[in-house]
């Protein structure tokens, strides 16, 4: 991912500054605007602006938030930390947010190695995996990249599935020139695949399990809207 690459490359540059550069279009891949989640391939040319190196600005996350996250931890080992991320809480700072889950945990555990192995949308709740050392981060990143991690989400959908199991294989992209616009199905988009399984129906609504075989931004809602 572009953001992970830049964090590694621009050591000492605050993450908030890196995400701001991406969001404002200052970072380009092969001459085109990029997203934080853009995947880099061998031979890609990445253009970045001059960046001032300085320590991260201190972040002060409220004690009640940090307590909530401590209570949300589901599993912990010397390599991993897994917690049930609450809906409405971003995983990292950026886009006008001064802190995220990773910042709160780092404040709560000063001096510990903690890195996000993946991301969840701000409004999505569920299992968030963090690495507790560099080797674990490398292995987890490879598993997410290679698709060996199974990602399943429970969703309440407005409308009914036409069948008990529906595969949506439709490319996704934002509207041209809109870095923060909605993600929609577009022929020129990135390959995206979601499998919806019906769990229960409630009149005009249904409760489904959505399994992601790709990891595009807003993939579930875009594919659900496409059914």
Language-model segment annotations:
Residues 1-227:
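RNA pseudouridine synthases
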